[in-house]
């Protein structure tokens, strides 16, 4: 009888899912306290006024207002201009 030998198994064929990093709230976008502004690995963006940084370098709003991105001294900063100041 003719037999076909079993095929070998491949050792490839797996990959991890993307981590969904990046900017979540863009410039001049309204945020409320606790909103995530940027998810990042390391400090690509640094926290400015009214912005907190989590354990994994996630930047989040500490107050309600509008998001602003700025470069200062060769670093990129993210700040939140409070809603009262933005309205005036």
From Swiss-Prot:
Segments of this protein annotated with the region Disordered: 1-21
Keyword Ribosomal protein assigned: yes
InterPro entries according to UniProt: Ribosomal_bL27, Ribosomal_bL27_CS
PROSITE patterns for this protein: RIBOSOMAL_L27
Gene Ontology CC terms: cytosolic large ribosomal subunit
Annotated Pfam families: Ribosomal_L27 (PF01016)
UniProt KW keywords: Ribonucleoprotein, Ribosomal protein
Entry's Gene Ontology BP terms: translation
Molecular functions per Gene Ontology: structural constituent of ribosome
Assigned protein family: Belongs to the bacterial ribosomal protein bL27 family.
Protein name as catalogued: Large ribosomal subunit protein bL27
Gene: rpmA
